[in-house]
Structures are given as C-alpha cells and as structure tokens.
C-alpha cells in the first residue's frame, strides 16, 4: 500500500521508499525514466493554491520525519523551520514582499499546525 492517509499531498513517494527500505527492499533509480499523468489538468496557481501547496509540503515533511526518524529529529526540524521562517516572514511583511511573506506565513502556519495536532484539510 503506497498511501498513508495522514499524508495529504507531497512526501508520499519519500514515505513509500523509506518503508520499502525499512522492509529490506532495494530502491532502484532510473534517471532516464519519464512518467506522464494520464488524466491530469493543472489549475491556475492562485494565492490559495500556493498557500495550500506550501502548507502541505511542510506538514507532510514534518509528519514523515517524525514517522521515520523519530520525535527528536522532527523537533529539530520544527525548530529550524521556525527560526528560519519567522524572521523572514516579519522581514518580508515589513518590506511589502507579499508573495514571499505569504509563503513564509504558510510555512510557519503549517509548522504550528503540526505542533498542535491539526491535520491537512482534504477538501
């Protein structure tokens, strides 16, 4: 089973490969391989979609880190994220760099949401 229901978007492939390695399986990399989604459409990258993307990338990263590397490692990553992105968020807010401000805010929000047990929205 490739899916972990706690990973809403992103990091599924990392989780899957780490589980295979844990089960003693070998991962083979084929850099020449190409994959194409059969019935895929792209939505325009609105501010809301960009927010959800950044949020889910960070939340999933923290979840997979704790799942495979333990609580201490995930706490270290949380501290690194907050120490890096809180000052950047404040700076980008002060100099009116909206796009960067919203990205950093999404990262901080996802990190805090993870700490307080809020899971990704699936709608």
Go through each PLM region and give its residues.
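Flexible, glycine- and charge-enriched loops at secondary-structure boundaries
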Residues: 7-10, 47-54, 101
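Active-site donor/metal-binding and catalytic loop motifs
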Residues: 23-48, 60-61
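A bilobed periplasmic-binding-protein/Venus flytrap-type ligand-binding module shared by bacterial periplasmic
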Residues: 64-66
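Residues within alpha-helical segments
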Residues: 18-21, 62, 112
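Non-catalytic, C-terminal membrane-associated alpha-helical segments of glycosyltransferases
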Residues: 52-60, 71-123
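A generic structural signal for secondary-structure junctions
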Residues: 40-43, 69, 91
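A short, conserved alpha-helix in the catalytic core of glycosyltransferases
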Residues: 1-34
């Amino acid at each position: 089973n490739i899916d972990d229901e706690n990973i809403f978007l992103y990091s599924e492939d990392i989780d899957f490969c780490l589980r295979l390695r844990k089960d003693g399986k070998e991962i083979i990399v084929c850099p020449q391989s190409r994959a194409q989604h059969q019935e895929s459409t792209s939505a325009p990258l609105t501010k809301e979609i960009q927010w959800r993307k950044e949020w889910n990338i960070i939340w999933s990263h923290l979840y997979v880190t704790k799942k495979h590397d333990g609580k201490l490692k995930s706490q270290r990553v949380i501290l690194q994220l907050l120490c890096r992105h809180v000052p950047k968020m404040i700076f980008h807010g002060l100099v009116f760099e909206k796009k960067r401000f919203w990205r950093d805010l999404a990262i901080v929000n996802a990190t805090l949401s993870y700490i307080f047990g809020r899971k990704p929205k699936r709608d």
